[in-house]
């Protein structure tokens, strides 16, 4: 087989890998748009817009299926070591993006229930947490698109800040429930929404870790710092 033919095959494969990355980034951008729209409808108390976000989640699911088929097709062509890491990242990252889309839809869905009750001041804290999560996702996608190790490392390290903000909101909501039992139901919805946002941050970190794997191979990463201390909070005062 002559060298020009080999070059053509390699270039064709590289082009297909590049198209795969572009499609995964597009999927990620849709998921971030869904998340930012969900945060917006919580603030505006817009049921119709929330319904649209929930329905739009199907588009992300369909994209994941399409990307998964494309990844498997490329995998069957016997990629080399670096390309194999690209293939593995191409399987893992869309799965994280799909979960991000699911959590964004969950936030929108709970906002509809929340809109039947008086507004709570803690929605501002929820939005701040959501903005941190959205930025983490955007940065993880940027690290993937640019193959940027430093951005990926920063996303991973900043997850502790997001956890700390989630814990602070968790405590704030518990205090608000203790002050008036009428706050319990809306605060529980906000607690679930906050947890969804915290999990989105975790999935953004997963994407960043897959970028580090893609760039460096099987390299042992230091343990991820976790600052989610909600499991240590005493709930007896609410349950009594």
Swiss-Prot record:
One protein family per Pfam: PhoU
Family label: Belongs to the PhoU family.
Localisation per UniProt entry: Cytoplasm
UniProt feature coiled coil, ranges: none
Function: Plays a role in the regulation of phosphate uptake.
Protein name: Phosphate-specific transport system accessory protein PhoU homolog
Subunit structure: Homodimer.
Gene Ontology annotations for the cellular component aspect, listed alphabetically: cytoplasm
Record GO biological process: intracellular phosphate ion homeostasis; negative regulation of phosphate metabolic process; negative regulation of phosphate transmembrane transport; phosphate ion transport
Principal location: cytoplasm
UniProtKB keywords: Cytoplasm, Phosphate transport, Transport
InterPro entries to which the protein is assigned, alphabetical: P_transport_PhoU, PhoU-like_sf, PhoU_dom
SUPFAM superfamilies: PhoU-like
Gene: phoU
Example of a GO MF term: protein homodimerization activity
């Amino acid at each position: 087989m002559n060298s020009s033919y080999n070059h053509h095959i390699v270039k064709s494969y590289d082009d297909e890998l590049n198209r795969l990355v572009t499609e995964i980034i597009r999927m990620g951008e849709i998921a971030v748009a869904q998340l930012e729209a969900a945060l917006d409808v919580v603030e505006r108390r817009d049921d119709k817009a929330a319904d649209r976000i929930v329905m739009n989640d199907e588009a992300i699911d369909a994209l994941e299926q399409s990307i998964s088929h494309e990844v498997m097709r490329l995998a069957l062509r016997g990629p080399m070591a670096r390309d194999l890491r690209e293939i593995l990242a191409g399987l893992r990252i869309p799965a994280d993006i799909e979960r991000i889309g699911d959590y964004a839809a969950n936030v929108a869905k709970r906002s509809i229930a929340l809109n039947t009750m008086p507004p709570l001041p803690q929605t501002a804290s929820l939005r701040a947490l959501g903005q941190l999560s959205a930025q983490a996702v955007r940065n993880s996608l940027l690290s993937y698109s640019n193959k940027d190790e430093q951005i990926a490392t920063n996303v991973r390290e900043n997850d502790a800040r997001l956890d700390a903000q989630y814990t602070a909101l968790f405590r704030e909501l518990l205090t608000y429930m203790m002050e008036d039992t009428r706050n319990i139901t809306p605060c529980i919805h906000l607690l679930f929404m906050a947890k969804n946002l915290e999990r989105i941050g975790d999935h953004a970190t997963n994407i960043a870790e897959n970028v580090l794997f893609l760039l460096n191979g099987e390299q042992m990463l230091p343990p991820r710092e976790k600052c989610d201390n909600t499991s240590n909070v005493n709930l007896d005062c609410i349950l009594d």
